[in-house]
Amino acid sequence: MPTPDAVCILTPTYNEAETIADVISDYRDEGFANVLVIDGGSTDGTRELAEDAGAHVVVQSGSGKGQAVREAVEDHIQAPYVLMLDGDGTYEATDATKMLDPLTEGYDHVIGDRFADMRPGAMTRLNRVGNRIINRAFAFIHGQDFRDILSGYRAFTRESFLDMTLTSDGFGIETEMAVECAKRGIKTTVVPTTYYPRPDGSDTNLDPIRDGGIIFLELYRRAKTNNPLFYFGSVGFASTATGLGLALYVAYEWVVRSISHEVIAVVSMAGILFGVQLLMFGVLSDLILSLHREQMKRIEELE
């Protein structure tokens, strides 16, 4: 494990007064004196409690978890290693060692798998199902199985974080980081961690429907540069299938009932042509991406 003075504990917060002091104390008890809390404008005394517990507190200049994490790492953290966690008391401080160990073994990014030891009541059934679907979608689209891409418990080198292209301002930051790891070949591993229910009186800032939709859109949007065959091919397939369905309907109506549907026939042909073009565009984009990755690999080998 890196020495504690080489690690910054990063905790983005928004109205976590019920838990933040205990979270900071737990990590300081583990030997981590460098604790940074970046706060999104809490109104419940979170900042004051964090300062009293020994953390360095800054107020983020924007809004949203993603913006807070980017600002913290880029502007306020100088330590070579970062352990990022939520301030809601759901993660185990004693897991810090196994989260950080891989960073001295050649890995640049570590994801804490909440499903490895999830305590009763830690996640609702809806959230559990949604997480599973998102993880499977990520593995299918981006070709990597990180098991829990939405985990807020992350350890990473500051250098690898700065190499990522991150734009999400909200809860999509974890998804973006996972996609960037897959896209850029950042050495990533997953370690089992314990995940607890939020303490009584602590309210979540996550909306499962709204934020789940945002995460799905982020997965699809990021496929454009990581899996263009899926990005263009999925729409192309849907368009082609719709066009073929309409064409079969037109043919049936004309052959069986002697009824012609000229407008629907034109729409069906347009759908088929548009879909085939997108499919071909996806194939060509995938070929170009493969050649680009091969060239980048050769350049890295020469360096």
Curated annotation (Swiss-Prot):
Membrane topology qualifier: Multi-pass membrane protein
Entry's EC annotation: 2.4.1.-
Pfam family, one: Glycos_transf_2
CDD domains: DPM_DPG-synthase_like
Family: Belongs to the glycosyltransferase 2 family.
UniProt xrefs under NCBIfam families: glyco_TIGR04182
Protein name per UniProt: Glycosyltransferase AglJ
